[in-house]
Curated annotation (Swiss-Prot):
It is a peripheral membrane protein. This is A-type ATP synthase subunit E. It comes from Thermococcus gammatolerans (strain DSM 15229 / JCM 11827 / EJ3). GO terms for biological process: proton motive force-driven plasma membrane ATP synthesis. It holds the Pfam family vATP-synt_E. Its main location: membrane. Transmembrane segments: none annotated. Belongs to the V-ATPase E subunit family. One of its GO terms (molecular function) is proton-transporting ATP synthase activity, rotational mechanism. The keyword Membrane applies. One of its GO terms (cellular component) is proton-transporting two-sector ATPase complex, catalytic domain.
Length: 197
């Protein structure tokens, strides 16, 4: 009996060892799987975090770009409004020049046009006020500009003169409107620089 008991004990001991070995291997495998799962989870969490940071940076850049565009758009709108006000004030000031000052300006504008036309006879066109002013001082005006002057039909303008050859084939537009238009881009740059640096 004793031999059978020894065999049973030996079988128990071997079985116990196998159980311990299997449990320890299972424990080791479980730890290994747990560690791999933790690393995968950490790696995935880092990837999600990187992706979120990238998306946040892209969104931040988009918001900044949109804000800059909005600021630029508003700045241009203000600039256009102010330039419009400056041009409007200039037109009002030119339209309200006192007669004596305006007469001398008309002489100067006409002489400038005569140089371009190179003719001894001219036809002047302008608004009603200008034509009446020149007509009331025609002898003085003709003498100052040095050519024969006749008056044409009135035109829509704030002032200045449209000077034509007698046959109307050549003309120099020295109305205030045309001169402002010719100077407008330069004036815009000057006003923009003065207002916005």
């Amino acid at each position: 009996m004793e031999g059978a008991e020894l065999i049973i004990q030996e079988i128990h001991r071997e079985a116990e060892q196998k159980i311990q070995y299997i449990l320890s291997e299972a424990q080791r495998e479980a730890e290994k799987l747990k560690e791999e799962a933790r690393k995968r989870a950490q790696s995935q969490a880092e990837w999600i975090l990187r992706k979120a940071k990238t998306q946040a940076e892209i969104e931040k850049q988009r918001i900044i770009a949109n804000a800059k565009l909005e600021v630029r758009r508003k700045k241009l709108a203000v600039q256009e409004e102010l330039i419009g006000e400056v041009l409007s004030a200039m037109r009002e000031k030119l339209a309200a020049l006192p007669d004596d000052e305006y007469f001398e300006a008309l002489v100067s504008l006409t002489k400038e046009a005569i140089e371009e036309l190179g003719t001894k006879k001219i036809v002047l066109r302008s608004n009603e006020r200008t034509l009446k002013l020149i007509d009331s001082r025609m002898e003085e005006f003709s003498e100052k500009v040095g050519v024969e002057v006749s008056l044409g039909e009135p035109i829509e303008c704030i002032g200045g003169v449209l000077v034509e050859s007698p046959d109307g084939t050549v003309r120099v537009d020295n109305t205030f409107d045309a001169r402002i238009e010719r100077l407008e881009s330069e004036l815009r740059a000057t006003v923009a620089k003065a207002l916005f640096g």
